[in-house]
Amino acid sequence: MGLRMSESAKPYFAMVCLQFGYAGMNLVTKTVLDRGMSHYVLVAYRNAFATAAIAPFALLSERKVRSKMTFPIFMRIFLLALLGPVIDQNLYYIGLKLTSPTFSSAVSNIVPAITIILATLFRMEKVEMRKVRCLVKVMGTLVTVVGSILMIFYKGPFINFFRSHLTAASSPPTADYLKAAVFLLLASLSWASFFVLQAATLKKYSAHLSMSTMVCFMGTLQSLALAFVMEHNPSALNIGFDMNLLASAYAGIMSSSIAYYVQGLMMQRKGPVFVTAFNPLIVVIVSIMSFFVLGQGIYLGGVIGVVVLMVGVYAVLWGKHVDDDGEETRHEDNVVAVKCCSGNNGLTIMPKIDEADEEDVETGKATSEKESSVPEVVVVVFCSENVHSVSRPN
C-alpha cells in the first residue's frame, strides 16, 4: 500500500518541483532583462542549451523505440516549436521586463482555464456539468482566475511581516501594466495551445524525449532567425561568461529540456489539464522568493490572491483525482474473472455481459444489433498449469 501511494504521489511531486524551477527562472531572467539583455537573444540561447542538454539522452535511450517520422508529425513539431520556444517565451519575457515576476506569473494563471477550453473543444477532456467532479474542476479553474485578478488589480496595504526595513516597491506606469498584460495573455494562449498540441502529438509520436529534443532544436533555429531579423546587428548575439550566459543555461536546462520531458511524461499519464493545473503555484513561490531574495514587499491583495489561488488549484486537482479513480474503476470492471480447474488444456473465450444483455438472455429477445456487435472478451489460454489472460476492447 505504501509503495502504491508513493507511485501515485510521484506525478504531483514532479509537477510541484517543476514550478520551483519555473519560479527560479522568472527571478533570474528578470535580472538579466533589466540589465539590458535582449529577450530574442535570451530565447535563442535558452533553446540551444535545452537542445544540448536533452539530445544525448534521447539518442541513447530511444534509439530502438523511436517512431517513424512522417510529414504530419514533422509539421506538428514545427508548430510546437513556434508556439512554445518562440511565441510564448518572447511574449512572456516582454511582459516580464515591463512589470515584475509576481505580476507576470499571476497573469499566466489564465493558462489552466484556456487549456480546459481548448481540451474540451478538441475532445481531449470531458466536461459534464451534471457531474460534481466536472463542476468542481470548472469552478476551481475560475477561482484560480479570480485569485490572479485579485493579485493583479488589488494591492491593498503593505505588509511588513518581520518589521523589517522593506518598503513598498514603486509600481511601473499603468501603460506598462496594460501593455504587459496583453503580451502575457497572448503568451498564455500560446502556452495553452502548446500543451494541447503536445498531448495530441504524443499519441502519434510516443518518443517524448526525441520529440522534446526536436522541439528545442526547431525552436533554436526559429529563435535565431527571429533574433537576426529583430536585432539588426549580429554582434547582439555575442554573450560572455557572465550572468547572461548563466540565465540562458538555467532557463534552457531547467525550464525547457527538463520541463518538456517531465511535462511530456505527465501529459501521457494525466493529460494537459493536470499539467497546467499546477501553474498557479508559480505565483505563490515567486512571491515568497521575491520577498526573501529580492527584498520586494508583499501586499494584502497578494496574500488574499494566494489563498484564493490555492483553493482553486486544490479543487481542480481533486476533480482530476476523481477522474483518474473513475478511469481505473472502469478499467477493472472490464476485466472478467475466469475460474477453471487445472489440467484443462485449450482455449476459452467468455464475453462480458452487461445488465442489458442479461435481460436479453433471460427473455430470449436479443436484438440483431447486439448479435452483430463484437463484445469485449477475455481470452484465457491454459498451457499446463500456467494461465495467461488477454483483454481485448470493443
From Swiss-Prot:
Membrane-spanning parts: 13-33, 40-60, 67-87, 102-122, 142-162, 180-200, 209-229, 245-265, 273-293, 298-318
Keywords of this entry: Membrane, Repeat, Transmembrane, Transmembrane helix
A Gene Ontology biological process term: seed development
Membrane topology: Multi-pass membrane protein
Domain of life of the native organism: Eukaryota
InterPro entries listed in its UniProt record: EamA_dom, WAT1-related
GO MF, one example: L-glutamine transmembrane transporter activity
Key word rRNA processing present: no
Similarity remark: Belongs to the drug/metabolite transporter (DMT) superfamily. Plant drug/metabolite exporter (P-DME) (TC 2.A.7.4) family.
Protein name per Swiss-Prot or TrEMBL: WAT1-related protein At2g40900
Protein's organism: Arabidopsis thaliana (Mouse-ear cress)
Lineage: Eukaryota, Viridiplantae, Streptophyta, Embryophyta, Tracheophyta
